[in-house]
Amino acid sequence: MKKFKSLFLSLFLMLNMSIFGAEKTIYVGAPKAPPVLPVLRMIETNALGKDYKIDIKVWDSPEVLIAMVQGKEAQFFSFPIPVISKLYNKGLNVKLMNINTWGVTSLISKDPTVKSWRDLKGKTLYIVLKSSSPDAYTHYFLDKEGLKEKRDYNAVYANKAEIINIVAAGKADNAIMIEPDTTAILAKNPNFKIIVNFEEEWQKYKGDKSAIPTAGIGVLGEVAEKDPELVKKFNEEYAKALQWVKENPEEIGKLAKEKLGMDAEIIKKSVPKMGLNFVAAKDVKKILGEYYKIMLGYDPKIIGGKIPDENLYFNK
């Protein structure tokens, strides 16, 4: 009987550690992009209290993110909006907690003949992060202008680090970039100009002033089921940290440099352009519903074939 109890306790501890990590470490899978900045502030302030340590696992492509989710390498993740819907529709138990990044994407070019989407005909376009929000919106906008990939233009995909190096080296004339990388490239090479602001383009096609949802924080479903109060606390503290980031661009720049090796000055300059605005998942269903309907009508594969149901959203 004692052996059975000992075995049961060992299995329980192993299961608990597989979900929460040793010594109650909370892992957040995120790219070096706007959604990670509030997490840095949470680490700095020990936002979840003395019982929890927060650590970041960096992903640099949706493929790496998906592998991290499948392997349960973290409990919380920064998700591009199309990716979390795809994973959910494939049967993975994930929950969307919030949307925190809106817009943030631009078409930039150093080709003087490129002044609109239509001018990309016959040209090569570098796109950051295949299957991400920027990728989905890029193809949606180009399709609206009557341009099809391969037939009318060539798309080349790269992760964030790769595309920065390619563009900075002058090996690309046209690129889809996100902040803070756009600010960094424009500072390094004044020949590049912003041709299309994605939020303005989205508003043009929708006929209103709605923001364009780009990324949010999500959580493994089993974590939300096991400890909903922890997830609720994380969401609340993330919202506070995001507001601090917006109000303290210089300080978050220093923190991003210290923790992730990001350029402090570029972060400082780009914070106002990052589209940082916290909206809890329970309050964003209508906005995302409209987005999903548009993408479903355009290309169902972008969101995994169907509009996710209510169980995608964390409602605490």
What are these regions (language model features)?
Residues I81-V83, V156, A161-L255:
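Pocket-lining segment of extracytoplasmic ligand-binding domains
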